[in-house]
């Protein structure tokens, strides 16, 4: 017995070491040296940047869940819960504030993959699957191309270790053990990725039904134990109750996150992109939800063959059928995505179940309990012929056929060949995972084969686009926090970065955001849409928007300082500049315009009205007559020479050129607008004086639909030329319009600037100060309107309303007033108490269970003593 234990322990150790080595090769080899385990796309601009901002807010407020963040004009902390509001790597960052968040996020993601592989191996062993077949299942799991998301869209897979623990916990309940492991695991899934929680619970439910149908965990792979007969029914009820209690307890503990997030999502919109408009078939013969794609389960033909083979066995038919149904019927993806779209990324939580079924099937094929069915290869071949990965899948299916022939030929003759060929069949999945993670190196070759794969380069360690953040933290600059700051250099990459010791920002990039503010940002203020989607709100050089939102400070590189701003600090290649003529964030206003009058205005007068008036629901008899400030220019006389022809003759050739103006412009706001139509549904990018607009390709995941390019710019003192940069493509430019207005009109509004005290946004404290109203008017802010604000004027509660189409304000009488504005996310208090109660009950149950074990042990000892 002891020798067997040592042999098994040695086998476990060797299997784990080989598994860790496999993961290291697959994940780290493509990264190489001098680069991060993370990509230059969303990983850098969204995930790590949002994590850093959350860390700063937690440290300043002393709270695990910051109520309000200084992004997007002011956002609920729950707007960023999609990226994992309580992720352990963010919390760890609070303990080690000097460690860069990039290092923590990358390290935690790698640790999650290693943990997923090792936990899967030991979980499969608890299912009575032998060591090397448990290793095979774990190897297939970590070879899934879905783990490409660990350095791209981290929330797609960062819950995986805890999903495996949840499945393990379900098995423990069937063994009459506590559901505590299940409860903790489900809670951690919710903390890491609430979006994937329903899909994970679906996977757990499928596994539970599978165990019920098998007669309990003991019968999972032919072991003892049964849930049959009268006693079996009682055991089923007990197991169902235990599993249900564990899940309910976990959801209750996570309610401080889930309830406010749910209300936040319901209060705003979510861009489903082109996927919402895509028609889907009743079934997907290419099984794109199962095979190859890193935005699906990402398995190979071996998994499909094992699924089809297992379907022929009674004990595995339900699990195999459920997985085939889930990955082959797009309607399942639609439901799990909350009816938003039918994207296969939501199926990734099924990967551990696929690993289980593959490991069990390979073992039974090896033992001879299941027979190879070469005819099933025809089904794999059929899927290959209609798959977008056709060349790769044909090769994969051919190798699979060779393996089957070797297995059948070695049956009863060469046991070693049969055993080792089972391990060799893992080579293709392992090599495929390596290829996907390093696809940037051979993207051209894949495209030559007709395989379209989205590749993003790994982040170079010397990347300096966020260096301003650390440099600003080392400076002692007296900012007026009743104004805002923007980063105009590399706006996309920096859109989610904000320090608590600097003014708030108007930019943000989150899949969940205030839809009213997003509409105002692009549709009302006509900020340039420079990226593939409208989710990224990255401010550019728009003088009307800067004035309205109070962008007093901007960070740029040398030579990129906008008109109207004066440099005040320099460090390295960055310049901090100031424009004190913009509006503050909060102020008293008297020049009011009714919403009805505003809605009668047309662009661009709407810009001027917002910058010179306060737009409120009703004004009574106090409204002044609005005088238009913009006038329209004739393009033929506005440009000198053939300037109009040059601009309208852009047809997709990459070029850069200058267009001279007929007369120099000084002290003006210039608006240039034209239509762009793509002839082949491709992308088009046109920059005017460094302001970039983009029409994204219709193949982009979330096309921006930006067919009207608008450029709002300050002419400065002597604008003589416009510099045009156009991208290559097949598009045409038409319907050119030009408007001008005096820049001074942006600053003519009569306002009262309050005296504000420092506040901590993470605690929900937005404004505390005094304002002296010279007459009756409105206290207007540029905090985006949403539910959750609390306003006190002279200690009395005041009801806020939407002003300036999308912001918070309220009427205020003449005189001096003390104003206090705070924010608490709807559902936060209720969720907090539910979580506190659930944690309390969970703790009591754990103590009760421990005490019960202690009492049972004591009884057994006393019983043995009496026997003696």
Where does each model-flagged region fall?
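Membrane-embedded helix bundles of polyisoprenyl
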Residues: 19-23, 110-127, 131-213, 242-262, ...
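Membrane-interface coil-to-helix junctions
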Residues: 21-117, 139-160, 265-270, 278-293, ...
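Periplasmic/ER-lumenal interhelical loops and adjacent helix-loop junctions
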Residues: 45, 52, 239-348, 463-470, ...
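Active-site-proximal, structured, solvent-exposed surfaces of multi-pass membrane proteins
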Residues: 47-51, 627-868
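Membrane-interface micro-motifs in multi-pass membrane enzymes
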Residues: 78-83, 102-115, 133, 140-164, ...
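Extracytoplasmic/lumenal acceptor-recognition loop(s) of multi-pass membrane glycoenzymes
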Residues: 79-82, 429-460, 475-545, 583, ...
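Perimembrane helix-loop-helix junctions
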Residues: 200-248, 399-409
């Amino acid at each position: 017995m002891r020798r067997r234990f040592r042999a098994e322990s040695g086998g476990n150790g060797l299997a784990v070491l080989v598994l860790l080595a496999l993961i290291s090769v697959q994940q780290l080899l493509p990264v190489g040296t001098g680069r991060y385990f993370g990509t230059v796309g969303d990983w850098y601009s969204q995930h790590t940047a949002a994590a850093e901002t959350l860390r700063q807010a937690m440290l300043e407020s002393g709270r695990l869940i910051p109520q309000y963040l200084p992004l997007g004009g002011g956002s609920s902390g729950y707007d960023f819960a999609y990226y994992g509001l309580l992720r352990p790597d963010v919390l760890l960052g609070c303990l080690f504030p000097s460690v860069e968040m990039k290092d923590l996020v990358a390290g935690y993601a790698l640790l999650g993959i290693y943990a997923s592989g090792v936990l899967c191996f030991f979980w499969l062993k608890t299912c009575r699957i032998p060591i090397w077949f448990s290793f095979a299942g774990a190897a297939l799991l970590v070879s899934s191309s879905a783990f490409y998301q660990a350095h791209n869209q981290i929330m797609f897979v960062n819950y995986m270790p805890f999903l495996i623990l949840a499945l393990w916990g379900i098995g423990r309940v069937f063994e009459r053990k506590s559901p505590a492991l299940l409860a903790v695991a489900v809670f951690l899934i919710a903390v890491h990725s609430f979006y994937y929680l329903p899909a994970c619970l679906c996977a757990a439910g499928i596994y539970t039904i599978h165990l019920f149908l098998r007669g309990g965990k003991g019968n999972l792979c032919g072991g003892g134990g049964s849930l049959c007969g009268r006693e079996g029914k009682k055991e089923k009820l007990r197991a169902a109750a235990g599993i249900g209690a564990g899940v309910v307890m976990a959801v209750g503990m996570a309610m401080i996150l889930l309830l406010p997030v749910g209300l936040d999502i319901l209060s705003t919109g979510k861009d489903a992109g082109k996927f919402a408009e895509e028609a889907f078939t009743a079934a997907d013969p290419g099984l794109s939800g199962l095979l190859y794609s890193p935005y699906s389960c990402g398995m190979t033909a071996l998994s499909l063959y094992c699924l089809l083979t297992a379907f022929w066995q009674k004990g595995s038919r339900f699990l195999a059928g459920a997985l085939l149904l889930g990955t082959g019927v797009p309607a399942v993806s639609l439901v799990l995505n909350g009816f938003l779209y039918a994207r296969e990324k939501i199926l990734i939580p099924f990967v551990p179940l696929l690993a289980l079924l593959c490991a069990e099937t390979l073992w039974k094929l090896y033992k001879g309990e299941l027979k190879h069915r070469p005819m099933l290869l025809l089904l794999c071949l059929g899927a290959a012929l209609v798959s977008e990965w056709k060349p790769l899948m044909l090769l994969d299916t051919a190798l699979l056929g060779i393996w089957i022939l070797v297995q059948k030929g070695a049956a009863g003759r060469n046991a070693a060949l049969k055993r080792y060929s089972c391990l060799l069949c893992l080579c293709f999945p392992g090599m495929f995972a390596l290829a996907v993670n390093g696809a940037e190196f051979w993207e051209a070759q894949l495209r030559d084969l007709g395989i379209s794969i989205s590749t993003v380069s790994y982040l170079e360690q010397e990347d300096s686009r966020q260096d301003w953040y650390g440099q600003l933290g080392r400076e002692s600059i007296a900012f007026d926090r009743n104004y805002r700051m923007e980063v105009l250099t590399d706006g996309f990459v920096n859109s989610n970065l904000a320090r608590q010791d600097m003014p708030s920002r108007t930019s943000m990039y989150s899949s969940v955001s205030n839809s009213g503010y997003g509409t105002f940002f692009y549709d009302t203020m006509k900020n340039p849409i420079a990226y593939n989607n409208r989710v990224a709100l990255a401010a550019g050089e728009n003088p009307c928007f800067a004035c309205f939102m109070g962008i007093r400070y901007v960070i740029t590189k040398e030579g990129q300082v906008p008109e109207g701003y004066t440099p005040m600090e320099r460090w390295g290649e960055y310049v901090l500049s100031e424009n004190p003529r913009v509006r503050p964030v909060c102020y008293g206003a008297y020049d009011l315009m009714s919403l009805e009058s505003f809605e009668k205005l047309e662009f661009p007068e709407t810009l001027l009205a917002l910058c010179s008036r306060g737009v409120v629901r009703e004004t009574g008899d106090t409204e002044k007559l609005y005088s238009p400030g913009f006038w329209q220019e004739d393009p033929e006389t506005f440009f000198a020479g053939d300037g109009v022809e040059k601009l309208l003759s852009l047809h997709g050739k990459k070029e850069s050129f200058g267009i001279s103006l007929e007369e120099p412009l000084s002290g003006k706001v210039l608006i240039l607008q034209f239509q762009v139509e793509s002839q082949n549904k491709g992308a088009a990018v046109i920059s005017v004086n460094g302001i970039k607009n983009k029409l994204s390709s219709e193949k982009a995941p979330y096309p921006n639909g930006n067919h009207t390019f608008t450029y709002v710019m300050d002419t400065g003192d002597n604008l003589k030329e416009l510099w045009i940069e156009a991208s290559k493509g097949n598009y045409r430019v038409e319907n050119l319009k030009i408007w001008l207005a005096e820049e001074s009109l942006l600053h003519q509004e009569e306002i009262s600037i309050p005296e504000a005290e420092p506040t901590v946004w993470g605690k929900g404290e937005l404004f505390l100060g005094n304002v002296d109203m010279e007459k009756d008017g409105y206290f207007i802010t540029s905090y985006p309107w949403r539910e959750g604000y609390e306003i006190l004027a002279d200690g009395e509660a005041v009801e806020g309303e939407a002003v300036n189409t999308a912001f918070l304000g309220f009427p205020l009488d003449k005189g001096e007033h003390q104003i206090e504005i705070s924010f608490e996310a709807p559902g936060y208090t209720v969720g907090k108490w539910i979580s506190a109660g659930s944690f309390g009950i969970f703790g009591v149950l754990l103590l009760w269970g421990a005490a019960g074990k202690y009492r049972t042990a004591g009884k057994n000892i006393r019983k043995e003593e009496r026997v003696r």
